[in-house]
Amino acid sequence: MNHAYTGKKYNYVYAAGAAVKDDVMWGPNQCLVKFNTAPEVGAKAEESVWYFGERCFMQEPIFARKPTGVDEDDGYVLVVVNDAGRDKSDLHVFDAKKIEDGPVATVTLEDHLPPGLHGYWSDVVHA
């Protein structure tokens, strides 16, 4: 989520999702999902999804707000994806408003990054 909304009413959550293999069995995290949690009471939450691929496993998504952003989802979602087929990791950058359009940028990292637990984006530069 946009951490500027921590402790406040917010609408959007970005999550790692499992790709459904069948009605019962779920797989590992292979999808980036954006949920709009603000529909009317009793209505289903709206979602946008991006599937990374058969042997691609994502880590926790991180929201990085645009410095000039106004809306809650004015920013980017950063996701490290481990591609088991290539034994490489990629950093994918998504426009937070349009997850379903796919990444706006992808950087292949020199090394394979093992799955991490949690991450956080800070607007402050620490020297």
Roles of regions detected by a PLM:
Residues 1-127:
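Beta-propeller domains
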